């Protein structure tokens, strides 16, 4: 029974990340929340014929200068890394966090889904989709753009990270239980 833990790290963009997690689990957009509180969500997701019990730990956020706790590395099999398309700085921070994760895993291939959130705010866009695609390709990761407000691809993000884990590990194992951070 392999333990699959997925980590969602989102520096400086707590509203976008939290709203994405809440939209995925609760099916509604979260306007207000406390960004300093770590939250846990659970949801059952079906991929093909398999059922996965996802446990999402919505972290209070990290920045490029933070020391990553071992809980973000040890026993974690996949990551959803989210930045805001309206913030170039958040995109740059995600690059730095990925490098720390990659080094922490011994530079092995990581199942990662890179998500450009807030796609509904196109007039305020600072990061073009092509930049996200290029960065994800350099990592061997999947790239998606989403909008928590419009519920655009929120389910697909978590389905994709499960598929990425399976692809990298080449096996789902007997029990499909995912812990998301």
Swiss-Prot record:
InterPro entries in alphabetical order: P-loop_NTPase, Small_GTP-bd, Small_GTPase, Small_GTPase_Ras-type
Domain of life: Eukaryota
A GO CC term attached to the entry: endomembrane system
Assembly mode: Interacts with MTOR.
Protein name: GTPase RhebL1
EC class of the enzyme, as a word: hydrolase
Source organism of the structure: Bos taurus
SMART domains reported for this sequence: RAB, RAS, RHO
GO molecular function: GDP binding; GTP binding; GTPase activity; metal ion binding
